[in-house]
Amino acid sequence: MKTIKEELLEKLHTKIDSVKHAIADQYEKIKPIAFKPETDILKLRKGEREHAMILRLTALARYKELQAIESSPFFFKCVIAHNTVDVRYRNKKEIHFGKYEFSEQNIYSWIAPIAVVRFANPGQTSFKLPNGTVKEITVHEKEQYMIVNGKVVFYAHETQDHPRELIYQEHFSAKKGAFILPEIVEIMEKAQDDVIRASHFGPFAIAGPAGSGKTTLALHRVAYLVQSPESMDLYPSNSIIVFVQDSGTKEYFSHLLPDLGIHNVKIKTFFEWASEILKLDTVAYVQNTECELDKLNLKNSVVDGGEKLKIDGEVITWNKNVFQTLRGIYAMSSSESLKNSFEEQIKRRTLDRIDITLALMMYKKHKGKLKIETESNRVMRMGKIVKHTRVDVLDYSLVVVDEFQNYLPEQLQLFKSCVSSKTESVIYVGDLSQKIQHGTIKKWDDFSENIAPDRQIRLHKVYRNTKQILEYARSLDYKVEIPEALKEGPVVQEKVFEEVRGEVENAASQNSRNIESQVFEYVENILKNKTAEKSVGILSFNLELLTRLRERFKDVDTSVKFLTIAESQGVEFDIVCLVGVSNHMFELAERYSTHPAFREEKHQIYKDLLYIALTRSMNEIHVLGTCRLKDVLVNLK
């Protein structure tokens, strides 16, 4: 005799099979339209041709949606009954919720108004229709699933009379970590729903520590704005831009957004975006230059003088040659080292974030608005060639700024100036306690952003890491909240390598080589013993050491990534090796030691970077160096 759990699981499998059969029927109807040869369409008359092409594109989009439904048809089911005197609607009804609507199987999209009922406890609740009508219902049963490639990997069930119960849970691989228990997933989804369904108009901020799910919340809000009938006309996907820190994050987003049904969204780094505006095709971007503090001080002295920007009363003039514009600005500095350093930049044709920000500020003041000007040649009658310039004023329906805390206030102001007045919609994602750049935003007032308190979402719990990793971070005096149901993992390994004494002559270089060889050997053992599917991140502040490690292991395993800590922000690995830990790893240049405010902010950035490094791992961390990490942090107080 079957148990109740077995019967429930069998019923779920029957439903999944029913969906698959219904999808197979839909495939047969859609395929002839979705895959109609373009040659056949081109044979049609003009009006018919355009109509056939639209039908083909629509059918192809639906075909891709059906493929996604087939893999993961739904993630929630509610058994409901409407609270009404009309007997036609008082019978119980099963409704499912998934990524895409499939009305043939009573599956609603997650953005449908009724989808909010999945967060209610069994019993009486309500939902609101787009026209404002409130529908009162009773939720009799709830079921939550995780279905991957048509296979059930998680299933929980609850009713009005019985609390939530786990029906089935498959073993989860280390790649994604153990499942973080239903109640935690449910809490995240409630926060997600509050975020995605908030009014579209105006700025929104989502903050939280690394691994708290803030990026997921932000991107689901984007998906909702693009797909919801109430907002989709205001947010065409090709009018949305997402600003990311680096190419690695860009690649991650470029895969994640289509999975949420979002296509044609622009994803750019600040430099890529600025390059289109300023025509920096032959310029290389560098993170920071040696005169960072001098440049920041000069930037902070720029005053808006109405029609012109000024420094100490002197007008800054715009030149199409960005290097000439910046040379004129830096000529106003009293720092000879800045002037000399920038001359070297001109020779190498490199610009940093401060250079580009100043140039964009000048461009905007000169042009009035940020715009992209594209030149092309047009062939006129009699073969005459005329140069044509197309001007596109930047006017985005939505701007998403990932890791907003790493931008200068002026950068954020430039982004904000390109947002449509119809929406004024910006989503800021990040955490002010994870800054990796000097001179960046400290508070919203820094660039005149006013975000209502109820639109500032703060996540506290971390879901990416193991309990042991967060306990280790807490032992280093980082303020971390550790969820009770968080997965367990191996204890953090901290290896201090001892210097081996040799001859007095060249002892320092010998010791350095000896320690480095021990680090290489340790890393080699980790790579030998790891399973094939596990990803490894080798992280360091020491770029030279990182380069030698990359060269040493370049042919060992392509799943191993060698990154600076700053480059690793937003990336995650199964195993992380933090290498090059020493008491000298955060020494400031002597010329900056007399600037207490600069030194204090730099020390805080270094502490934040260490926290970022520790939270890159989903399972296992090895800290390797000549001293303990706790000793390094003592020097940063």
Which residue ranges define each predicted feature?
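Short gly/ser/thr-rich secondary-structure transition/capping motifs
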Residues: 186, 379-385, 557-563
